[in-house]
A protein has these predicted regions:
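Hydrophobic/aromatic-rich, well-ordered segments within soluble, folded domains that form packed cores
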Residues: 31-46, 102-103, 198
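Gly-rich Lys/Arg/Thr-decorated short loops/hinges at beta-loop-alpha junctions or inter-strand turns
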Residues: 12-24, 42-47, 78-81, 121-127
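N-terminal entrance/gating region of PLP-dependent enzymes' catalytic architecture
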Residues: 1-36, 42
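Short, mixed-charge, low-aromatic patches
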Residues: 16-24, 49-52, 165, 206-212
Length: 212
């Protein structure tokens, strides 16, 4: 840990002893740190809302799928729409967690090359990744627009540091942006997991997982 952070944050009593009168188990310093974290995530992803983190990136992606599942339109629920598309260049661990969570909800996960994806009304959502697991950067702005016109909800897994240089998914029109906060230089914590970030739009503020 850099000395300046150790002195001014980790060793600063104002960060870890200023207890709030209404919630004695959490310090004001932690609340401020979480607010700063959420503000950075919101700014980097170009999304209006970010939660206080989740377990890891794969968990965040699966939570996005479940949020979409519970946010289907009445017409989609009535029609029994249960397909969720995942691009095959998404991290394999993310795909595995999504499949596991989907199985017990009755969601049908389709994993394939995005080039083969024929977006139709039988899908309630889609997950793509940029940069993908191979480091390739693809701007999905046109695709996102087309998918949403067909009633699909769109999640994008992304890399925080890359968003300092490339167009953030929020500007594409994505509904959710997820990823790993380890890119900020967080320590390994005995091999992981790393904090997963989750950012979304105002429309999902009552559905988003975790703490706001």
């Amino acid at each position: 840990t850099p000395g300046v952070i150790t002195r001014n944050i980790l060793e600063n009593p104002g960060w870890y002893t200023s207890y709030t009168p209404y919630q004695a188990e959490i310090s004001q310093g932690r609340l401020e740190a979480l607010l700063n974290y959420q503000t950075v995530i919101s700014d980097m992803t170009a999304m209006p809302l970010a939660n206080a983190s989740l377990l890891d990136e794969a968990t965040a992606a699966s939570e996005a799928m479940l949020m979409f599942w519970h946010s289907r339109s009445r017409a989609q629920v009535k029609a029994g729409i249960k397909k969720f598309f995942v691009a095959n260049d998404v991290f394999p661990q993310t795909i595995d967690v999504i499949k596991t969570r989907a199985y017990y909800q009755g969601i049908e996960v389709i994993v394939d090359d995005i080039k083969n994806f024929s977006a139709g009304e039988e899908y309630f959502g889609v997950l793509v990744q940029c940069p993908n697991q191979y480091g390739r950067i693809i701007n999905y702005s046109e695709e996102v627009k087309a998918w949403k016109e067909k009633g699909m909800q769109v999640a994008v897994a992304s890399d925080l540091m890359s968003l300092a240089l490339i167009t953030p998914p929020g500007e594409w029109g994505a509904d959710v942006v997820v990823g790993s906060s380890q890119r900020f230089g967080l320590p390994m914590a005995f091999g992981g997991p790393h904090t997963g970030f989750f950012a979304t739009t105002d429309a999902y503020k009552r559905e988003m997982p975790g703490r706001i």
